[in-house]
């Protein structure tokens, strides 16, 4: 005699409680890998990686990009030990708009015997010259950008002042209308170099005026430097201060990365959608309601494990080991006809990832070297046979 199974595993993970809205839309990175992808390749593959020009070196362990949209591609499957290895397969791909980032400052850390890493000092330097240089190098011949270098710098400084008024002050009679306050950055840098630091990190800024979003306010994030010795990392950070970094200086085609960001918000939802609770059939006592869990608890009070309605989505989450299919400098190579829906045109550098990732379009995402990499370490990206440029309207 058939009957319903009354016992089942619980619905919904308890590992992501509390299911509340993220505090900030720009995620804070709580942990960094101890080795960069380049260090892992040399360690695991040895001469095979060295012959490809890969060597351990100081490198930023993270980058920032905006989610533009999705398409699909046909590639040659280069994964070993799969039944499609060496054959053409169709895969979904996600395109990220990845304009260069500006290194506004450095932050040195010392170790406190009781509290761990504590900030020792900061150095800030104007990125205006670097912004003009990267515009002339990457975006000046772009037919879709109608702004000049002067307008780009002015809009960036105006947006940066809204984020941190202490860094930029208005100067109506100057070339850009604003001035970046450096405040003796050379003396502060020498003080940092003379101190016995335990770690040094960069303070990076996005350049949204060069993306397809159309906003001016940049995001500021701290990024750790990995690889090499501490003195090599300090020298590398000194070279980056006040300059720009492109995505191909941080990542390599074919490697795996982690995606950190805030998921798409769903608002206030019930237990069926929020936890996947079994919806029982409506019977003659349906006046008591359907799509509910019935009794929440015994009389002593509600248990926290019981599914209840509430906020769904807009949570800070991390996705591990997403593979980079391609890194390019001309965004119109991957922009479909009519642009990405709800985003528009990718003007400059971009990243193509295998599969889907968290967040809606235009969401800021932090890309990090893998903190728990897989057992397979590919040296190259798979061969792309076809990429779909067809319009996504109505799909």
Curated annotation (Swiss-Prot):
GO terms (BP aspect): translation
Function: One of the primary rRNA binding proteins, it binds directly near the 3'-end of the 23S rRNA, where it nucleates assembly of the 50S subunit.
Keywords from the UniProt entry: Ribonucleoprotein, Ribosomal protein, RNA-binding, rRNA-binding
GO cellular component, one term: cytosolic large ribosomal subunit
Assembly information from the UniProt record: Part of the 50S ribosomal subunit. Forms a cluster with proteins L14 and L24e.
Protein name, UniProt field: Large ribosomal subunit protein uL3
UniProt cross-references to Pfam families, sorted A to Z: Ribosomal_L3 (PF00297)
Region (Disordered), start-end ranges: 286-313
GO molecular function term, any single one: rRNA binding
């Amino acid at each position: 005699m058939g009957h319903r199974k009354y016992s089942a595993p619980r619905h919904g993970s308890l590992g992501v409680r509390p299911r509340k809205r993220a505090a900030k839309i720009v995620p804070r990175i709580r942990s960094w890998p101890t080795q960069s992808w380049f260090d892992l390749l040399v360690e695991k593959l040895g001469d095979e990686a060295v012959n490809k020009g890969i060597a351990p070196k100081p490198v930023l362990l993270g980058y920032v990009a905006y989610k533009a949209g999705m398409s699909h591609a046909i590639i040659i499957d280069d994964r070993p030990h799969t039944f499609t290895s060496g054959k053409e397969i169709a895969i979904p791909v996600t395109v990220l708009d990845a304009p260069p980032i500006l290194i506004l400052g450095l932050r040195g850390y010392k170790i406190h015997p009781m509290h761990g890493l504590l900030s020792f000092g900061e150095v800030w330097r104007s990125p205006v010259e670097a912004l003009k240089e990267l515009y002339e190098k990457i975006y000046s011949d772009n037919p879709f950008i109608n702004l000049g270098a002067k307008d780009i710098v002015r809009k960036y400084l105006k947006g940066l002042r809204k984020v941190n008024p202490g860094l930029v002050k208005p100067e109506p009679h100057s070339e850009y209308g604003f001035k970046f306050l450096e405040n003796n950055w050379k003396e502060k840098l020498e003080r940092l170099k003379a101190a016995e630091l335990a770690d040094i990190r960069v303070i990076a800024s996005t350049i949204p005026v060069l993306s397809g979003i159309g906003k001016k306010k940049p995001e500021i994030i701290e990024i750790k430097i990995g690889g090499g010795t501490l003195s090599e990392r300090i020298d590398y950070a000194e070279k980056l201060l006040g300059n720009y970094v492109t995505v191909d200086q941080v990542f390599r085609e074919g490697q795996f990365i982690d995606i950190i960001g805030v998921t798409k918000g769903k608002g206030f939802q019930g237990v069926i959608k929020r936890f996947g609770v079994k919806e029982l059939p409506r019977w003659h006592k349906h006046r008591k309601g359907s799509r509910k869990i019935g009794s929440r608890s015994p009389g002593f009070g509600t248990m926290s494990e019981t599914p209840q309605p509430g906020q769904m989505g807009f949570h800070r989450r991390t996705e591990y080991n997403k593979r980079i299919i391609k890194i390019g400098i001309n965004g119109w190579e991957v922009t479909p006809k009519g642009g990405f829906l709800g985003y528009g045109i990718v003007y400059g550098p971009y990243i193509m990832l295998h599969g889907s990732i968290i967040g809606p379009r235009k969401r800021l995402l932090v890309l990090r070297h893998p903190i728990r990499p897989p057992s397979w370490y590919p040296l190259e990206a798979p061969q792309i046979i076809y990429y779909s440029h067809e319009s996504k309207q109505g799909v």
